[in-house]
Amino acid sequence: MRIVACLLLITALFSSYGYAAITTSSPLSIGVTLSSPGGSYELGFFSSNNSGNQYVGIWFKKVTPRVIVWVANREKPVSSTMANLTISSNGSLILLDSKKDLVWSSGGDPTSNKCRAELLDTGNLVVVDNVTGNYLWQSFEHLGDTMLPLTSLMYDIPNNKKRVLTSWKSETDPSPGEFVAEITPQVPSQGLIRKGSSPYWRSGPWAGTRFTGIPEMDASYVNPLGMVQDEVNGTGVFAFCVLRNFNLSYIKLTPEGSLRITRNNGTDWIKHFEGPLTSCDLYGRCGPFGLCVRSGTPMCQCLKGFEPKSDEEWRSGNWSRGCVRRTNLSCQGNSSVETQGKDRDVFYHVSNIKPPDSYELASFSNEEQCHQGCLRNCSCTAFSYVSGIGCLVWNQELLDTVKFIGGGETLSLRLAHSELTGRKRIKIITVATLSLSVCLILVLVACGCWRYRVKQNGSSLVSKDNVEGAWKSDLQSQDVSGLNFFEIHDLQTATNNFSVLNKLGQGGFGTVYKGKLQDGKEIAVKRLTSSSVQGTEEFMNEIKLISKLQHRNLLRLLGCCIDGEEKLLVYEYMVNKSLDIFIFDLKKKLEIDWATRFNIIQGIARGLLYLHRDSFLRVVHRDLKVSNILLDEKMNPKISDFGLARLFHGNQHQDSTGSVVGTLGYMSPEYAWTGTFSEKSDIYSFGVLMLEIITGKEISSFSYGKDNKNLLSYAWDSWSENGGVNLLDQDLDDSDSVNSVEAGRCVHIGLLCVQHQAIDRPNIKQVMSMLTSTTDLPKPTQPMFVLETSDEDSSLSHSQRSNDLSSVDENKSSEELNASS
């Protein structure tokens, strides 16, 4: 699956100087406006419908007619002609009327009384601490009816928080209307518009690059939207990203309940999307088990095997009660696959469908498993295997099912056997061809048996030998000198038949076991599971690549094995296992002092330098994280797990993919949201690694302060206040080996690496120079993810060891890893 130009690099939010700002001594009054530095947006007072009521709002500058994108006091307008927007004595942004009475406040609990308010070129109104430069409040976290590029909707179940859009009451009344747009917490999430407390329209589940209930989002659709969910921590973020053609654009929830994406082409506003589009799109239009056909007359039909619950109501056009099953299910799903009785339930496939509501995500890895899983579950009424999602199942009524003219998904509906086989006409056609088909099958079976016996007598396991011979020949032709080809029984013996006692760890691609060969050499065996997202081709490419990469800071591949369905990689064994065991364990972290940690940082950097610059192959790792750094007996680091790595050719500097793979928290913003990756993506991951090594804090779980800020925010605040010296792991504070200057410099370098804009990050050669010299370092910009408190967007910053993003169908725009290149 390939995403088309979706979600280009999110432009970082930044502070700007040298232009007017709102301060205690310089308030904004009626008739005066504040412009963003580039002149894209304007903040000021406006009157709606010439009513005399004044609102503080933000709009596109130099665009007519005026488009209001945010309103501060939408619930309480100012009726007088004298009002001021200013900074209060405690640092809040406040609106005062002519009597100095408080009309609106940004709220919060500011920690500084030395603040200013600025309008950024992104359209974000921010309150800035003059001392630290931190944002104390921002309008992007308090949306109205409009989303601008870089804004997001979110939910946070543990903290009972969510960010939504709320419509205006009318086109001229900014007060909250009756429609709310949000993302749902189910997995996968979907967009939902509510009218009051009732569902009004939904987008269908998110499938990685598109909403399944919006057929317009096909391969040609330029999609400015992106979503990341963290099922483990109960958070999700849906973002409106920056595209080349969407810089001047917005998403608006209208007073009528429509969600519109609109962009400006330089002369006119163009509607890019609108939903709901037809009456069929309204939620539950045809009731339970009803099917709303966009092109149908009447629009409502019953799904196959169902009939109207009330014929009279249905004929009169009242479809709300829906349909009921015509023939009861026999539900013999627990029978074996070979059992083919006349009463066995069957599935009827309906194409071009918007998946019904109340779906559940099942853990089956392919369509056949999804089919069989639903068949065995008597409560399963339907299933759909969706590209970009996987297996969706329904265990209750099918509601809000729509049939499109084109696009959509295939819904497999469970029916009684008689619903598909009770037609005499079908039986006649079947009987007419049955005899010929049986004869043909018998002939083919006889031929097959004869060939099988010949093969058995001539040479056993020829097909298996051919397969193994083919991949061995392929590898040998690629100049993989020194690579051993292991037999499966040797690896079974070495690992005690892959005993759980030998298990070292488990990831998205399979399980790693410790083993010992007959000569006493210890090894690590990565055994790919049958449901692994890494297929044979990717497995072969990984072998070809790693076998040609030789460096002291890269894990060495000793050999491989393919035996039937078994695919195994054999690596050198690292006695100290992975880095996370040391820096996050309360006892083992005492074994690595600052000198050792600094040596590990430098070793990882040297390994990256080899991958990015010094090797004859240019490789982007894409999954650099603490658990993928292994340690030998001398605590020297080795970069491991190249299952997601990509090879760059010639002057290629970046690539993009529709299937974002990697681990949240370590993924760069441009990669997590847009699928765009480069060497700078690895640099971002390296920066996160540095901060984890220095602090002993884990990106996935650490939070501090009343706002539950994440590790990047913690590092930024510490560096801003004292150069990051207090970031050192507290267990190292009393150690003589701690070099506070060196550690502070590493914090500085780490912050340079996690800057939001890829172009601002240093390359690995510059990082190595910074680590080995004392030259002055440039000032980093505040990381984007710092601007959201971690409890509100933890889905962007949490590493998911058991929930790594690893989509199987990755149609890459550049070549797969291929050592023959």
Curated annotation (Swiss-Prot):
Its main location: membrane. Residues 276-312 form the EGF-like domain. It is a single-pass type I membrane protein. The modification Phosphothreonine is found at T657. The modification Phosphoserine is found at S532, S547, S627, S640, S700, S701, S807. GO terms for molecular function: ATP binding; calmodulin binding; carbohydrate binding; protein serine kinase activity; protein serine/threonine kinase activity; ubiquitin protein ligase binding. Its EC number is 2.7.11.1. One of its GO terms (biological process) is recognition of pollen. ATP binds at L504, G505, Q506, G507, G508, F509, G510, T511, V512, K526. It catalyses: L-seryl-[protein] + ATP = O-phospho-L-seryl-[protein] + ADP + H(+); L-threonyl-[protein] + ATP = O-phospho-L-threonyl-[protein] + ADP + H(+). Residues 1-20 form the signal peptide. Residues 21-140 form the Bulb-type lectin domain. Residues 796-808 have a biased composition (Polar residues). Disulfide bonds join C280-C292, C286-C300, C370-C391, C374-C380. The chain crosses the membrane at residues 428-448. Residues 587-604 are annotated as: CaM-binding. Residues 774-821 are annotated as: Disordered. Residues 449-821 are cytoplasmic. Residues 21-427 are extracellular. Glycans are attached at N49, N84, N90, N130, N233, N247, N265, N318, N328, N334, N377. InterPro entries: Bulb-type_lectin_dom, Bulb-type_lectin_dom_sf, Kinase-like_dom_sf, Pan_app, Prot_kinase_dom, Protein_kinase_ATP_BS, S_locus_glycoprot_dom, Ser-Thr/Tyr_kinase_cat_dom. PROSITE patterns: BULB_LECTIN (PS50927), PAN (PS50948), PROTEIN_KINASE_ATP (PS00107), PROTEIN_KINASE_DOM (PS50011), PROTEIN_KINASE_ST (PS00108). Residues 331-417 form the PAN domain. It holds the Pfam family S_locus_glycop. Belongs to the protein kinase superfamily. Ser/Thr protein kinase family. This is G-type lectin S-receptor-like serine/threonine-protein kinase At1g61360. It comes from Arabidopsis thaliana.
